[in-house]
Amino acid sequence: MRDSQTVNAPPKSPVAGGPPAISAPIMRLQTGTHHDPFEVLGVHAQADGTTVVRVFMPQAEAVEVAGGRMARVAGTDCFERVLAAGSALDVHPVLKWQDKRAGDWHQDRSPYTFAAQIGEVDLHLFGEGRHFQIWNVLGAQLRTIDGIAGC
């Protein structure tokens, strides 16, 4: 059995000058094992003043945000774009993406730019198996959040 440091360590590039290693959090997203996708996806301010926008879109060939193309993280279905410090960006930016199959362009917003909608009490009761109206919390609950209808 491997220790947790070995399991969570990012993979190394097998060949010098080969494709870059994929970070551990992005690899966990790709494999569906990340416990908190909000940690990686969405809009994140960086210490140097830049902003990173990151999405996971397995159905997309290409993705654009804030008027520019996002780069695919090699070997994954994650796309990201780093915006310069001081760049104007909507809190919930519109994503434009091209479908892999048909090539059609669509637009949407990333759900990971919105705050989590399940409260602590609901999570606690659900975890205990004592939430007797969980259908009011989970699933498709049509709402308007931050002025955006249909969230």
Residue ranges and their predicted role:
Residues 2-47, 73-151:
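The feature marks proteins involved in alpha-glucan
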Residues 64-66:
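Beta-strand signatures of extracellular beta-sandwich domains
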Residues 56-62:
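Short proline/glycine-enriched turn/loop motifs at strand-loop junctions of beta-rich domains
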Residues 68-71:
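Beta-strand-rich interaction surfaces with strong enrichment in secreted/lumenal proteins
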